[in-house]
Amino acid sequence: MERPNLAHVTPDVLEYIEYLEMQLWQKPAKVEPVAAATEPSEPPTSINIISISQSGVAKRTPRHLYGRQHRAGMGVFDLDTPEEDPPAFLVAADITDRLLLFTNFGRVFPISVSQVKETEVRGKGESILTGLRFMNNERLVAVLPGMGGEDVLLASQRGWVRTIRKSFFGAQLIPGMSFHETKEGGELRAACWASGSGDVLMVTRQGKGVRFNQRQIPGRNGCLGTRVDQGDDVVAIAAVTDESGVFMVGNDGKGTIRQMAGVLANKAPGAGAKVLMKVDELVGAAAVKPDQDIFIISRLGKLIRFPAEEIPTKEGVVQGVNCMALRADVAAACTISEFVAESALK
């Protein structure tokens, strides 16, 4: 558009127009964010990414159908659910494996991965809770693949922790079997697989955490793992060592990888938690290796996959870096899985 003839304009108005023109000229152009380009898919794999809503509506999609983006990309639309039933869980598991569904009452229900409806990346799921005898006010709080270690670690909302041997989750597992008493630390909140000989990291919604050795957890009854502040609660538990990194992500899509070398283990469970990440609300935490991929899903059903190595590792407290571009949306859950390059199969 050409500049019109301003000869008839008074000097003071002309001066003001020229001032505005100069401001616009000096102001950098605003670049609208666009979806990050995806890398070619990995070779076909039997590993599936399972997306699950708050009410238990789920779908599975082969992992290789999710293209890799770069950190801070916009992701792709994944699980299609109503606004009132947003995605809440994300898990990677082999098609031949089972899923362990943990409820807030500490009960466990096993189902086969193959039972979950398979769809394209964007798809509507079906309830995986159909036929399961849930009690009043019972709901899903954690989902694990059927295999992943020697023990399962359980954490309650008020910081109680217990360890359960993997043999209890074998073929003889009775659907609905209970492994947690809500009178001990409140309802169940998180679960993870562990090696049986490493350390435990418990993380709260306010980004605080505590680390101690798993062998210090007494028997099946467990103990207080950490003292949780009023208004806070446990959201994740992870099995770690000095060499481990733990990916932590907030609802704003910012995340970090905390190196456990910078988080000293307490001499015993039960200590107060210390700040690990500056965050308004932490939504997930999981142990991660540099050669693995991170998957994050939002409440609007968008999912991003990117290499863990794109996140700077830190030994100190940080606010995190942008992991997922969110517009009127919040991050809901995350999971970690491998990336198999074509060259690895040759």
Regions found by a protein language model. Give the residues of each.
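Short, structured "edge-of-domain" segments at secondary-structure transitions
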Residues: M1-K346
